[in-house]
Structures are given as C-alpha cells and as structure tokens.
Design a protein with these regions (language model features):
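Conserved catalytic or metal-liganding residues and their short signature motifs at active sites
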Residues: 1-211
Length: 211
C-alpha cells in the first residue's frame, strides 16, 4: 500500500509537470502570436521620446498614443530577450498596424526617423548657419561661421535632437572628402598648388555666379 501510495503521488506529480509544461508551451505560443499580430495603430504615427526617457515612460506613451495595446507583454519580452536596457530614445515613425515585434525591433535597433534638410548651393557660411539656427529639428547653439567654402551644400538626413555643431562638423568632413576626391583627379595643367586654393577658387566662382 505504501508503495502504491508513492506511485500515485509520483504519477500525480508527473501529471502536474506535464500540465504545467503544456500550459507553458501554449502560453509561449500565444505570446509569440500576439507579438507578431498586427497592432492597433490605424495610421502611421510619429512619436518623439527625449533623451533619458525610461522604458516605462516609453511603453506608457506607446499605449496612450495607440501604437501598442499590450505594454506588459512587450515589457516582459524585452526583459526575457535581454533588451530592456537597449531601448533607445529618439523620434520614430511607427507604421500602420505595426506589431509589438515591429515596435520592439525598431526601438532596440534605434531606427529613428530622419528629416531632410537641404542646404542649396550659393549660400555663404553665415547664411547656412542661419538656416541651421531656424531649423527646429536641430538642437544646441552655433557660434562663429566657418570660413567660406568649407561646408558642403547638400541634402542631409538628420534625426530630431541632433546638435547643430555636429551637423556643421559633418558638413565640413563631407566637403573635405569631396575636395580630396576632386584634387586627386584634377588636371595637372591647372595652376593650383593646394586643395585650399581649389576651395578658394570654387568659392569665388560660386559667389560670382550666384549674383
């Protein structure tokens, strides 16, 4: 009888384990389905999370703005995948019907929305700086303008909150690379001794043609 009792107890224990395992499998499957199912967002939405916005605040805003409808599940998935600390602040464009997985992947990868900022040819350095100061996507102050010809006129794609000084540095780096490429392919018969002379000449020509 004692042995029969132990067998019954062991059988009951195995049954409980089986039920628990089955429930876990079903729960995991349902959670995965929910993570990949189309979300509640009825149309594309642009949301901005300032620097140092924590995960609970991000989840709360995503829910209140109708991007997600299961913040607890998303929080749990981020934690289980070790990505809770990898969520990045910034401005994001969430697409219509974006799933929880879509939203998570975007936030973890930091795929922020980029704004187009066009700097046309013919502007002086001071005019370029004035355009950057007037652009409300950028942040931070600018002091004196760089020398003429050091900023590349181009269409730049910038994230909200990018510092104006960082963009100036990028414009200078891009211009330097372009000048180096042109200098390497220049006609040796042209009487220019340095890349700086090339930039100076280009600036003069640009000013004259822009009048």
């Amino acid at each position: 009888k004692s042995r029969d009792g132990l067998l019954s107890l062991f059988s009951a224990f195995l049954s409980l384990l089986l039920v628990a395992a089955l429930a876990a499998v079903i729960g995991f499957s349902l959670a995965q389905q929910k993570l990949r199912a189309p979300g509640p967002l009825a149309s594309d939405k642009l949301l901005y999370f300032p620097a140092r916005t924590d995960v609970p605040e991000i989840l709360s805003k995503l829910e209140s703005d109708g991007v997600i409808d299961a913040p607890l599940l998303m929080n749990l998935a981020l934690w289980l995948e070790g990505n809770r600390g990898n969520v990045k602040a910034g401005e994001y464009l969430f697409k219509k019907d974006a799933s929880l997985r879509d939203v998570m992947d975007m936030l973890v990868a930091g795929r922020v929305y980029l704004h187009a900022l066009t700097i046309p040819e013919g502007l002086t350095s001071e005019q370029i700086l004035q355009r950057l100061r007037e652009n409300d996507v950028l942040a931070g102050d600018l002091r004196e303008a760089p020398k003429e010809g050091l900023l590349l006129p181009e269409t730049y794609r910038v994230p909200r909150g990018m510092s104006r000084s960082d963009l100036i540095r990028k414009m200078q780096d891009d211009q330097r690379r372009l000048v180096d490429q042109i200098w390497a392919k220049r006609d040796p018969s042209i009487p220019l001794r340095t890349p700086h002379e090339l930039v100076t000449l280009a600036s003069i020509v640009e000013k004259e043609t822009g009048r």
